[in-house]
Amino acid sequence: MGFENSPHPPTLFLLRSILRYKPHQHRTNHNPMIVQCRSLTLPGLCCIPPYTFQQRVSTCKKPILRQIYHISSHQDRTKQSGRGRILARGKYVVSHPSDQAH
């Protein structure tokens, strides 16, 4: 319902719909790119495309650096030196090229 009017495929829509990063449920240094797949049949962790799950380090890696928008009111955003990982509390949205075609 409504998928035919959405620029994104249903799978991406479902993924985005369950990506509710709640800071009180995780440690402060929890990687916001890692989300438990409670609503999906896939066990373990889910990564937002184009992120891919790396089993050895148990984290999400992205092949191309893309901007991550911090849409929360929290101001305690820090960057880990040398790694480029954004550590913060709040909600995160990964920007895709299709999102900027407004």
UniProtKB/Swiss-Prot annotation:
Spans annotated as Disordered: 73-102
Entry protein name: Putative protein p21
